[in-house]
Amino acid sequence: NSMGVISEAGCPAVADPGADVVAIAQRKNMKVVPLVGPSSIILSVMASGFNGQSFAFHGYLPIEPGERMKRLKELEQRVYSEHQTQLFIETPYRNNKMMEDIMKACRPQTKLCIAANITCEGEYIKTKTLKEWKGKLPDLTKIPCIFLIYK
């Protein structure tokens, strides 16, 4: 018997509950065949203008404000110390809050790429310094989005 895993958005099993299904298949010694399709993570790196040689995807950051600010500062430090692009996502209804937190936690010269609705109608991918974003953040409520920071 065969089965497939399809993701509603993004790539199955990457920051997706499909990973649980794949883990079960691996434990049962079933053959797993990944198929190539669009990955918003890779597409956002490609469109950002950031380092595509060294990058890290962190999934969802902490919700608690203090922990989130601490994590954002840690990721920004990795940008400058390791020259590594940092990627993360947020639940769409919290995107605007995430952008505000990035603006508060990170340096004005740090670059932020906002990649939203990738491969969909209304696709939005822009890279600017935080100083350039100030006062001009888009409304991303209820839109799938990836955030990337770099120097």
Where does each model-flagged region fall?
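A contiguous loop/helix-start segment that scaffolds small-molecule binding in enzyme catalytic cores
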Residues: 1-2, 81-151
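General beta-strand structural signal in soluble alpha/beta enzymes
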Residues: 7, 34-37, 88, 114
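Short glycine-/acidic-enriched loop or helix-start segments at secondary-structure transitions
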Residues: 14-16, 44, 98-99, 124
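Conserved phosphate/pyrophosphate-binding and hydrolysis machinery centered on Walker-type P-loop NTPases
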Residues: 11, 61, 65, 88-92
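Ordered, amphipathic secondary-structure segments that act as subunit-interaction surfaces
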Residues: 1-17
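Fold-independent oxyanion-binding glycine-rich loops
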Residues: 8-9, 38, 60, 116-118, ...
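Class I SAM-dependent methyltransferase SAM-binding "motif I" and its flanking Rossmann-like core
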Residues: 16-78
